[in-house]
């Protein structure tokens, strides 16, 4: 088996490649660069591409995917593409139009995975972050079970092959799983996960329910002032990680990615650097010993780089619970 084709089976029968390419970039990165790097990622062997409506780059990501289909590098069915339902579209009647908007931007007929970006509903409208005159977010009240039913309809309509969630805690997952008349379980929960926040309890819970945990921020996140928790350490400068990188003759980033893969986590690697995009594919070329895995477990400090502090007062703010 080609290790680059390493996949996890989802609870609905579809499969997800365990290494994905994250496409999020700060606003100052020119959009044309997104097209370039997404093409580079596909050329390097990435088959799982992760984006979102709110990244404001689905036109470019779609263009890159289509050009790689047109030049014969891949077929559409070789690519696993994820999009996300933004917080201003959580009302059930807005779910399908939001997905259709993403599909129009992408110029694709379907997405492989559509996930609820956060369990936090914001006031519907054009603004991604609707604020009142005091600069506070304007929340909306939506029953997430009703949102989920609308997601199920998108799957039935063939607009999304699989449906899942992101940034949900255990209680919120259980709310969906215990919903009367549930038709499809979420296939995944995409959350921040790395050696400093290893999510061991949430991971065990997800595994027990046959839900795949997908890790974003696996390399410690881009250090964007607006979102970064204050006094955040730099993950890839961690001495244990760096010592291990020397031992295996790999980069600290590869050690961090491999650690998650060996725990059964699907990992998103985000990079706009050509050399590192290619380098990240080497994660399939080596294995960490169980002793080294234990040492990496010891790095956990429950540090969340992206606490979404601006929504802390929302009744469904997910990070107040232990997990």
UniProtKB/Swiss-Prot annotation:
Where is it chiefly localized? cytoplasm
Q: Do you know which Gene3D superfamilies this protein is assigned to?
A: NADP-dependent oxidoreductase domain (3.20.20.100)
Could you tell me the keywords of this UniProt record? Answer: Cytoplasm, Lipid metabolism, NADP, Oxidoreductase, Steroid metabolism
Tell me the InterPro entries matching this sequence: AKR, AKR1C, Aldo/ket_reductase_CS, NADP_OxRdtase_dom, NADP_OxRdtase_dom_sf
The encoding gene is PGFS
User: Where does it live in the cell?
Assistant: Cytoplasm
GO CC entries: cytosol
Its function, per the record, reads: NADP-dependent oxidoreductase involved in steroid metabolism. May act on various hydroxysteroids.
List the expressing tissues. Answer: Detected in endometrium surface epithelium (at protein level). Detected in endometrium.
Protein name (record): Aldo-keto reductase family 1 member C23-like protein
Site Lowers pKa of active site Tyr — annotated at: 84
Give the EC number.
Answer: 1.1.1.-
Q: Which organism is it from?
A: Equus caballus
Could you say which enzyme class this protein belongs to? oxidoreductase
Catalytic residues, chain numbering:
55
Describe, as the record does, how this protein assembles with itself and its partners.
Monomer.
